[in-house]
Amino acid sequence: GFAVAILYSALQLHVTNLSQLLTIDEAAVPGVMIVLAMLAFAAMTKSAQFPFCGWLLGAMVAPTPTSALLHSATMVKAGVYLLIRISPMMKGTLTGVLVTLIGGFTFFAASLMAIATSDGKRLLAHSTVSNLGLIVACAGVGLPESVWAGVMLIVFHAVSKSLMFLCVGAVENVTGSRNIEDMHGLIIKLPKLAIVMIIGICGMY
């Protein structure tokens, strides 16, 4: 989708710069909406929106530091960053409505799946997908307030989620399990780590 958007924009609109694309009047140049739709599609697949979230959940076999990078600050953030950049163009468009609906559904569905998960890393993965859905929904609205809300969610999610993944990895190294059912009494066994986890949880919400 991203490659198609670039090629179409270059060949039909003679624009290869995203900043220039954002200044084009979509009403005067119909082809802009095609580029916008393809960019939004590419961004949503990159940011693990339903139904393209399977790869992110499958990455749980990776070591914990790798999971922290994948889920908090690098790969998935590229997609939502692109959506935030093109968010003003999506305001009041069909593309924006679809992006908002898909983001909202992903947020709700991933939250429900997280409730039924006992694996600590997989639970955090569902939480990541859910948070990304909320950011995508904010980007689809296209209002300045929603864009700023999305930006703040990106920052808090990047910091807090990486902290949470590293904490779960530390618990797994000490206890030999990342099942949340085995984490009862953690405040007594590992008080400092438990406090850090609480800070990460508070940062998420």
Model-predicted regions and their roles:
Residues 1-205:
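...captures the hydrophobic TM-helix bundle architecture rather than a specific catalytic motif
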